[in-house]
């Protein structure tokens, strides 16, 4: 199976609780390689741009306000079947419904403050990684 990439965001709630290190360590234990990483504080306009597909939905303003309230940690991660595996490791969007041991179950508080964001499919991952990282910022894949 070929290597795949996905975007991970450690959201403001998890950053404020100083759980980013534990989350990154867990992702590495699960076989993800960090290909790019940066800590940034999104402006409201940047958050609106990233979540543009949700514009017009009832939760959009609250989401944008939350994501721009304090720094986040964005990462381009790589492994086989990265998107699906990441979704499995982070768990359901609602921490109350997430499986035991998943990142959202361990570190999330509610549907809005659920610790992490993850791409939902490979095409989305490519777009999301490009939103945060210029091509030269992402380490190339290892060759055999």
Curated annotation (Swiss-Prot):
Catalytic activity from the UniProt record: a 2'-deoxyribonucleoside 5'-diphosphate + ATP = a 2'-deoxyribonucleoside 5'-triphosphate + ADP; a ribonucleoside 5'-diphosphate + ATP = a ribonucleoside 5'-triphosphate + ADP
Highest taxon above the source species: Bacteria
GO molecular function: ATP binding; metal ion binding; nucleoside diphosphate kinase activity
Any single GO CC term annotated in Swiss-Prot or TrEMBL for this entry: cytoplasm
CDD domains in alphabetical order: NDPk_I (cd04413)
The enzyme's E.C. designation: 2.7.4.6
UniProt xrefs under Gene3D superfamilies: Nucleoside diphosphate kinase-like domain
InterPro entries in UniProt: NDK-like_dom, NDK-like_dom_sf, Nucleoside_diP_kinase
UniProt binding sites for ATP: 11, 59, 87, 93, 104, 114
Localization in the cell: Cytoplasm
Record-annotated active site: 117
Top class in the EC scheme: transferase
The keyword S-adenosyl-L-methionine belongs to this UniProt entry's keyword annotation: no
Cofactor: Mg(2+)
A biological-process GO annotation: CTP biosynthetic process
Alphabetical keyword list: ATP-binding, Cytoplasm, Kinase, Magnesium, Metal-binding, Nucleotide metabolism, Nucleotide-binding, Phosphoprotein, Transferase
Protein family per UniProt: Belongs to the NDK family.
Protein purpose: Major role in the synthesis of nucleoside triphosphates other than ATP. The ATP gamma phosphate is transferred to the NDP beta phosphate via a ping-pong mechanism, using a phosphorylated active-site intermediate.
HAMAP family referenced in this protein's UniProt entry, alphabetically: NDP_kinase (MF_00451)
Complex formation: Homotetramer.
PANTHER family cross-referenced by the UniProt entry: NUCLEOSIDE DIPHOSPHATE KINASE, NUCLEOSIDE DIPHOSPHATE KINASE DDB_G0292928-RELATED
Protein name according to UniProt: Nucleoside diphosphate kinase
Lineage, highest ranks first: Bacteria, Pseudomonadati, Myxococcota, Polyangia, Polyangiales
